[in-house]
Amino acid sequence: LCDIGGSSMELAVIADGKVGKRMTAPLGPLRLEGIKGGKKGRKAEIDRNLDRLVDVVGTGHKRLFLVGGSWRAIARLDMERREDPLHVLHEYRMTPRSVVATVKWIADNDLTELRGRTDTSEARMSLVPVASEVLRRLVRRLRPAEIAVSAYGIREGMLYEQMPDRLRRRDPLIEACRFAEAKDARMPGFGKALFGFLRPLYANARPARLRLVKAACLLHDVTWRAHPDYRHEVCFDNATRANLGGLTHSERVFLGLALLHRYKNSRSGTRFEPLMELLNAQQLKDAEILGKAMRFGAMFSVQDSSMMGAMTWKPVKKVLVMQVPKASRALFGEVAAARFQSLASSLGAEGNVTFLK
């Protein structure tokens, strides 16, 4: 983790939720602006301090987290250069090559123009050129596999410091979704039942995918107040632009697209198509399947989860079976049958329905 302020820069190694080796250096852009010798003098000062830092924290780490306003300003400029369609800074990812390209791009462009394009304050933009020099040389020396941006700062850190360990261990994404469900859903608590209902479709899913499925189930009904013609758009906006933690950009779009398909079969023609480029073909398909599964499962919004029935997914035989209990047979009408077959079709499967006696 690298936190930059006006006068100093701190590095700390984070592993297994614990802070390891850490080091500080006078590499803040405000201080470096006053170094004698111009750019050549700054380069020597930066390299001298980076030598000390690298000796302590090492190189070749999996990820470098950037904290601080100057880093966020550079990340926003990276978005502008790359024409990224999703302007959410938290968990924004960059490669070392992208950082180098952006630093050069900043140097080659007019700062006043860039400030207007990114809505960056004059005071913040004035520090970007020097901060860019530090970041470029820092990335070159540390050689991280990727760079991630944190929108959090000292306020969030102080709050986290006050939390008991049992709260710290919770998933920030799931907790935020639970809160949204409790506050806005028509039937708070049904998201858990819906997740259990869909679980057979994800018997072999990795934990990272399961948490997105769970998050989607918790959020599946929180935008019910929106007009039906626009509900799918509100769902997508809610997931991709809300203040949710623990999500990469591609995960935000996956979650948003799944919720879009919760209310709408087709995504073609929507204003969100540029964002779909953040997902590959398989991810687009998986999000559609999840959305259609929630669309079907939501028809069994009952207080008693045992009345929902159960699905069985046979991926080898490509057969999806729905067992409808006697108490819920009236719920499985023409619309439910159509939604079930739509889900089976998305899976490339044959859909069979069994009515229990």
Model-derived segments and spans:
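Extended, folded domain segments that form the structural surfaces/walls around functional sites
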Residues: D3, K314, E350-N352
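Glycine-rich, histidine-containing beta strand-loop boundary motifs that form or position
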Residues: D3-I4, A151
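C-terminal accessory domains/tails appended to large, multi-domain proteins
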Residues: A336-F340, S346-A349
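A short amphipathic beta-strand at an alpha->beta junction
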Residues: L347-K357
